[in-house]
């Protein structure tokens, strides 16, 4: 677009749209602000675009204000840092305190992005007070939007301001009555770890994490489980065993399948990536030995799943000596579901243990299961025997 044409024709149309009585046109004009701002010279942008943005941030239609809140970061890029500080910070603060929840939701979702283009001092002076207000907003969706991005403010504010001012807000949001708020904070905890350090993390956030491990909403418990390996790598094995080790076994007995499954995968990750096979032998296997005899068959199934995941990590010798006897013993279980899962686990162990162990222990157990009264048990046992034959032939 030629500059002369842009200034005369397009800007004329744009000016008409910004003053239109229908809010749908003004709504669309907001997007035009960001696009035009990138095309115009800086002085023209300040003269034509900035006043429009400021006016739109106070528009009588909440839909227009919502659009400004949604596009604000792009609008800041268009008008440059100096104008952002003098003109758009007050506009953004108004949007964060808007009387319509939808506008506050859009504005809250931008706090970290907006703070990144400010100095820490400006962010602390102008944005942080609004963040404190939003953390107790009457709308759960506003709090949820804030929780999904607030962690990103930690690197902007630095360690001291994060500890003194952001951390109390994190902790209050971690205890929010609305599960999505708690969930959004948990999923971004790693961003604050890097700023405040592990010592403070263990003092301040760990009690909240332990509490959330028993949260009534399974998705919150699941989010905590998924955060555990990262936490483990930062806490170290001693601290982890002391503070969080008990949670691992607790999750293996959760009433939700998704939690039990994630917990089993967690055990594998901790053994494979964080603490090693010796840790698993000392801290996990003894408790697995106890749980394989749990009265509830679903928990016994979870342990079988955990064994199948741990075996490749622990290797042939430990699997043959410590895990395989548990699996063979479980083949005598009264529940068909346990027995056909035993057949599946035995099949997964065939490539891990020595061939002599397959012949002396695994095959006899599978042969017995292949004659079980239950059709599913027979099917999976036969499949495992075929797999054993194929491994034998290929070797």
Curated annotation (Swiss-Prot):
UniProt keyword Repeat, yes or no: yes
Pfam family, one: HEAT
HEAT repeats: 44-81, 83-120, 122-159, 161-198, 200-237, 239-276, 279-316, 318-355
Gene Ontology CC annotation, any one: nucleus
Repeat in keyword set: yes
Record keywords, A-Z: Repeat
Gene Ontology molecular function: protein phosphatase regulator activity
Function noted in UniProt: The PR65 subunit of protein phosphatase 2A serves as a scaffolding molecule to coordinate the assembly of the catalytic subunit and a variable regulatory B subunit.
Family listed: Belongs to the phosphatase 2A regulatory subunit A family.
Assembly description: PP2A exists in several trimeric forms, all of which consist of a core composed of a catalytic subunit associated with a 65 kDa regulatory subunit (PR65) (subunit A). The core complex associates with a third, variable subunit (subunit B), which confers distinct properties to the holoenzyme.
Name of the protein described by the UniProt record: Protein phosphatase PP2A regulatory subunit A
Protein species of origin: Pisum sativum (Garden pea)
């Amino acid at each position: 677009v030629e500059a002369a044409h842009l200034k005369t024709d397009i800007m004329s149309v744009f000016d008409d749209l910004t003053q239109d009585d229908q809010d749908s046109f003004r709504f669309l004009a907001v997007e035009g602000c960001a696009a035009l701002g990138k095309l115009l010279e800086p002085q023209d942008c300040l003269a034509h675009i900035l006043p429009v943005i400021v006016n739109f941030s106070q528009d009588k239609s909440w839909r227009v204000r919502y659009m400004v809140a949604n596009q604000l970061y792009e609008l800041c890029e268009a008008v440059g840092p100096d104008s952002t500080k003098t003109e758009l910070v007050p506009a953004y603060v108004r949007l964060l305190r808007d009387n319509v929840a939808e506008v506050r939701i859009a504005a809250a979702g931008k706090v970290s992005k907006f703070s990144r283009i400010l100095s820490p001092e400006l962010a602390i002076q102008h944005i942080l007070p609004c963040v404190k207000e939003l953390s107790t907003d009457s709308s759960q969706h506003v709090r949820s939007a804030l929780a999904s991005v607030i962690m990103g403010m930690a690197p902007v504010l630095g360690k001291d301001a994060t500890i003194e001012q952001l951390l109390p807000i994190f902790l209050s949001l971690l205890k929010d009555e609305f599960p999505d708020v708690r969930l959004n904070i948990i999923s971004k905890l790693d961003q604050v770890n890097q700023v405040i350090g592990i010592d403070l993390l263990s003092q301040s956030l760990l009690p909240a994490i332990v509490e959330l491990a028993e949260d009534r909403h399974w998705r919150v418990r699941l989010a905590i489980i998924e955060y555990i390996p990262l936490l483990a790598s930062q806490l170290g094995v001693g601290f982890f065993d002391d503070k969080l080790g008990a949670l691992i076994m607790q999750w293996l007995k959760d009433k939700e399948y998704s939690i039990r499954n994630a917990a089993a995968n967690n055990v594998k990750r901790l053994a494979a990536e964080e603490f090693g096979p010796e840790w698993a032998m000392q801290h996990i296997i003894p408790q697995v030995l106890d749980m394989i005899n749990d009265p509830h068959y679903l928990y016994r199934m979870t342990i079988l799943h955990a064994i199948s995941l741990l075996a490749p990590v622990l290797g042939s010798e430990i699997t043959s000596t410590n895990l395989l006897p548990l699996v063979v013993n479980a083949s005598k279980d009264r529940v068909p579901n346990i027995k056909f899962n035993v057949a599946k686990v035995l099949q997964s162990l065939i490539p891990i243990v020595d061939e002599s162990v397959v012949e002396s222990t695994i095959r006899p157990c599978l042969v017995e299961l292949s004659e079980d009264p239950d059709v599913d048990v027979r099917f999976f046992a036969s499949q495992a025997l075929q797999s054993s034959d194929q491994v034998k032939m290929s070797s």
